[in-house]
């Protein structure tokens, strides 16, 4: 079937290889370097020039006013301008912190102050690397395939599984079996490390290959490497067993391989149609970009500019010869995907990212499962830093090394985040001055640094990460990732690959006190700190000291807001729907037993049922057996169902027993539609400061309310903490 590519492809005359597109520049190289040098010298001058409080406030105020004035203008130049102003203000702050605020004080002041300065330097480096990473996102578009299908390469599709239930794997396999690709050039393989007879029988019924091995060495990476030896396709497409591909996946992905012989990897987004724990427990699904959207919506496009696209383990196609050249999927770390991309790039291969969602999967169901997944990612990036550090060795350009450095450093935010959550308590409890400066001077330097950086990120990240939500995500995960990352740095061989649980249910709402325990402790410390601060305010005289008290009280209050949102995330809401509903608006036909034919449109669907809106509402009795007509490639097929509910013309139906071909048809006409996820990808409104602030405050208030309810329940029934999934320490 011919493919209509979701994004307009470039005309043939304008096709450029990935390499030439990355290096394209309107300025000669010498002139570019001259401009960079001039900018660096100007920045050094701006950073180092001494200013008093008034001059500093005027300088930073002017830059902030300019940024406010231009922030809504279009064009990349505006973003580069805002980044430059943000760096100027932030560099002034860091320079001031290092040269003016680490003066003589007590040993305790100096040690605690050094810890805070270290956390701030870490945040500054991440800010600079983040700006570099998204300096000029490539925004690559799909390239059409040749009209002659004989020129299309052969592809092996791998779906690795271990302990996931067949109900999760089933839809992915059926979707893979209807991918639009010449029949003689595609082979589907289910790689079952669970060695289950039920899966073997299912594969035989569907007509795909069932592949297993005698051991589970190296987990998912070993599973894929073992399967590589049993097949011979030119390329390998890999899907996690819950990632359902669309029919057009390969036609969107493969064009670039035929236009660039050095291209080894095409990665596409991981889109999740079910809410993750943050979205479900904070009721932000569809309202706030989830934790992963920044990476797949912006950072990977930025990486692509520098030929530093990461392989993400699923929704990707890899060139077989390139993969075999680097020894298969990397097995030395628990983030085998990112490490494999690094090995390919070291060998001079190019990698590409297409921000076109052509597969969708299930998000983690519980906060504890989500945390366990992030622990593995954090440990794996720390292992890469030790075992195959991108800053060292041959084969990478400086730009690639910087992208990997940002990715590795990102997962070390645990310690800095905990420092931020406790730093004001040093003064409120003990009177320690961690910053040797007046509150006014701190505000004059720190506030512009924070405001300018947030305003810039508001412009750059707006559709993919709303303001302050990064604080909530990092606060929630900080306690759990700082130890694995530090341990992996010391001994990268410790730890194991843990499979992320998918397809589970939350039978009843409950408060996961086990996962929230560190944050309950931190919240208690901050509450006591607030009390101590108020007492200091009452009993300590002197306007200078009062300013310092107010500054630390405000900081502590902000920390309490973040901790409240974190605690709300640990309050698991009930999730009893095993098959998640997906919005879909397409024509369908409802056939009644008496012969009536009712034209309708779908509202949403799942593997178990569908909601439809009748064109002409009429009462339909619940329990009535019906047939639902769904079209695929212009042909309609009916599927058996029963009416469950009729609400003013919106009818809910439940599918009944279907044949394998009917089930395959259902998947092909719903989950596997080429455009099914496009309307839901990157469609969030641009962020607004007050809206984000209100959402975070609402989440925090919900957390305090749920904590209060949990305390009351515990007092009545006795405290019995629950944990949904054991965490790997």
Swiss-Prot record:
One of the protein's GO biological processes = UDP-alpha-D-glucose metabolic process
Domain PilZ stretches: 575-671
Residues involved in substrate binding: 240, 242
TM regions (residue ranges):
30-50, 110-130, 171-191, 405-425, 427-447, 520-540, 549-569, 610-630
Q: Name one Pfam family in it.
A: PilZ
GO MF annotations, alphabetized: cellulose synthase (UDP-forming) activity; cyclic-di-GMP binding
For the region Catalytic subdomain A, what residue ranges are annotated? 151-244
Q: Where is this region: Catalytic subdomain B?
A: 321-381
Q: What is this protein called?
A: Cellulose synthase catalytic subunit [UDP-forming]
Report the source organism. Answer: Xanthomonas axonopodis pv. citri (strain 306)
User: Lineage, please?
Assistant: Bacteria, Pseudomonadati, Pseudomonadota, Gammaproteobacteria, Lysobacterales
């Amino acid at each position: 079937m011919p493919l209509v590519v979701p994004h307009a492809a470039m005309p043939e005359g304008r096709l450029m290889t990935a390499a030439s597109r990355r290096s394209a520049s309107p300025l000669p190289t010498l002139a570019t370097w001259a401009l960079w040098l001039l900018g660096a010298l100007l920045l050094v001058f701006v950073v180092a020039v001494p200013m008093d409080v008034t001059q500093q406030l005027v300088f930073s105020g002017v830059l902030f006013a300019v940024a406010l004035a231009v922030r809504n203008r279009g064009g990349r130049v505006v973003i580069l301008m805002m980044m430059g102003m943000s760096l100027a203000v932030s560099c002034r702050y860091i320079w001031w912190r290092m040269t003016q605020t680490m003066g003589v004080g007590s040993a305790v002041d100096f040690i605690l102050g050094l810890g805070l300065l270290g956390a701030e330097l870490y945040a500054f480096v991440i800010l600079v690397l983040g700006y570099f990473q998204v300096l000029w996102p490539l925004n690559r578009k799909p390239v059409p395939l040749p009209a002659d299908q004989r020129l299309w390469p052969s592809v092996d599709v791998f779906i690795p599984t271990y302990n996931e239930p067949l109900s999760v794997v089933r839809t992915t396999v059926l979707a893979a079996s209807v991918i639009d690709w010449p029949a003689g050039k595609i082979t589907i393989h289910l790689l079952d490390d669970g060695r289950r007879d039920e899966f073997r029988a299912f594969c035989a019924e569907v007509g795909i290959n069932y592949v297993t091995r005698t051991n589970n060495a190296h987990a998912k990476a070993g599973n894929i490497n073992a399967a590589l030896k049993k097949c011979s396709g030119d390329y390998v497409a890999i899907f996690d067993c819950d990632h359902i591909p669309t029919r057009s996946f390969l036609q969107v992905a493969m064009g670039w391989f035929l236009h660039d012989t050095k291209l080894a990897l095409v990665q596409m987004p991981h889109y999740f149609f079910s809410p993750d724990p943050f979205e479900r427990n904070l009721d932000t699904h569809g309202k706030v970009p989830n934790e992963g959207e920044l990476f797949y919506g912006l950072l990977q496009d930025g990486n692509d500019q520098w030929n530093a696209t990461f392989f993400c383990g699923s929704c990707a196609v890899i060139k077989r010869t390139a993969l075999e050249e680097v020894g298969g999927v990397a097995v030395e770390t628990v983030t085998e995907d990112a490490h494999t991309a690094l090995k390919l790039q070291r060998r001079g291969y190019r990698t590409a990212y297409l921000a076109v969602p052509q597969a969708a999967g299930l998000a983690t169901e519980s906060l504890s499962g989500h945390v366990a997944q992030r622990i593995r990612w954090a440990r794996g990036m720390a292992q890469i830093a030790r075992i195959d550090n991108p800053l060292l060795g041959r084969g990478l350009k400086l730009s690639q090394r910087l992208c990997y450095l940002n990715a590795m450093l990102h997962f070390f935010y645990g310690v800095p985040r905990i420092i931020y959550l406790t730093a004001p308590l040093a003064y409120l409890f003990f009177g320690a001055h961690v910053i040797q400066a007046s509150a006014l001077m701190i505000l004059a330097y720190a506030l512009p640094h924070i405001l300018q950086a947030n305003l810039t990120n508001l412009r750059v990240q707006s559709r993919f990460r709303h303001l302050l939500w990064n604080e909530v995500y990092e606060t929630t995960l900080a306690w759990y990732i700082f130890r694995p990352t530090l341990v992996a740095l010391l001994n990268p061989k410790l730890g194991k690959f843990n499979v992320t649980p998918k397809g589970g249910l939350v039978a009843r709402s409950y408060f996961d006190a086990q996962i929230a325990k560190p944050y309950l402790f931190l919240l208690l410390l901050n509450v006591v700190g607030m009390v101590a601060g108020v007492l200091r305010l009452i009993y300590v005289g002197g306007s200078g000291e009062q300013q310092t008290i107010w500054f630390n009280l405000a900081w502590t209050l902000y920390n309490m807001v973040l901790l409240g949102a974190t605690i709300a995330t640990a309050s698991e809401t009930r999730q009893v729907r095993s098959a998640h509903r997906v919005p879909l608006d397409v024509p369908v036909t409802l056939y009644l037993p008496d012969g009536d034919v009712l034209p309708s449109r779908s509202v949403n669907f799942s593997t178990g049922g569908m909601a439809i809106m009748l064109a002409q509402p009429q009462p339909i009795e619940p329990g009535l057996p019906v047939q639902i007509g769904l079209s695929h490639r212009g042909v309609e097929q009916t599927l058996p169902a029963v009416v469950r509910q009729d609400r003013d013309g919106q009818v809910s139906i439940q599918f009944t027993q279907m044949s394998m071909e009917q089930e395959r048809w259902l998947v092909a006409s719903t989950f596997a539609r080429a455009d099914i996820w496009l309307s839901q990808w990157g469609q969030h409104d641009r962020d607004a400061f007050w809206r984000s602030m209100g959402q975070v405050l609402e989440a925090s208030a919900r957390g305090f309310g749920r904590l209060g309810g949990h305390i009351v329940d515990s007092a009545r029934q006795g405290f019995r903490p629950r944990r949904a999934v054991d965490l790997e320490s």
